[in-house]
Amino acid sequence: MALNISSVLDELNIQISNGYQEFFTENRVQQLVDIMDTVKNDTFFPSILNIFRFTNIPVENIKCIFVGQDPYASYKFSDELKEDIVPEATGRSFEVNSMNTWTDKIKQSSLRNILKSLYYLQTGEKETLEKIREKISSGCFFILSPHDWFNYLEEQGVMFLNTCLTVKKDEPGSHIELWNDFSNDLVRYLNEKNPKIQWILAGKVAQNAIGSMVNNSICTSHPRLDSFVRECPFKLVDDIDWFGKTMQS
């Protein structure tokens, strides 16, 4: 049976018109069909409509790509009966689906340290998470709420990209090998089509995997490490409002 490319792209919610026409060739789409056939019997995250969320940003508009490894394999239950699960993965690296405010409990150390690093960027001070939350609540430190923050940065051209796009429930790293070839080709494509992209490569895994493929890399510790806070890669990225101040005004 002939491959119906348009149908596959629609099913996977891939926004090919945003500069990805040359990337999603017939061979590439067949590659995706093969990957999805491999994982279809797993409970995997994120939801199928969010796997290719990165295509929401037109290639020509990308200013910065913050590289993660694979989606969160954790989840929460949608109700007290614990019948339906809601994945923490959203299709954007480091974003946590269940976090609506910065005062919510942050289990993921990466997101905690990202918030601390943003506070350090604005104040030059390294502070505890509790103190930062107090300053957010009192209005002394302004930053958009978590989901609004990710949305706002995406609108400015910041892509939060995992090099592995799916994960099996409760099994971090379970799909990494499935996505290696696809991810390497995607990185090369984005770098070629938009050589001005600044790539935040946090941790040795990202640096070793991608560093030689891209023009403009910002190398830092992984966000789960405390050293990330003071290294603060955000200060090296051009023309990005990391807090939402322009929206506030």
Q: Where do the PLM segments sit?
A:
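Cysteine-dependent deubiquitinase/ubiquitin-like isopeptidase catalytic cores across multiple families
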Residues: 246-249
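Low-complexity, highly charged intrinsically disordered N-terminal segments
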Residues: 2-10
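Short, flexible loop segments at boundaries between secondary-structure elements
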Residues: 214-244
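A polyanion-binding, active-site-adjacent surface
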Residues: 14, 21-194, 198, 206-208, ...
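Polar low-complexity intrinsically disordered regions
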Residues: 1-2, 192
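Short loop/helix-cap segments at secondary-structure boundaries that form the rim of catalytic
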Residues: 208-214
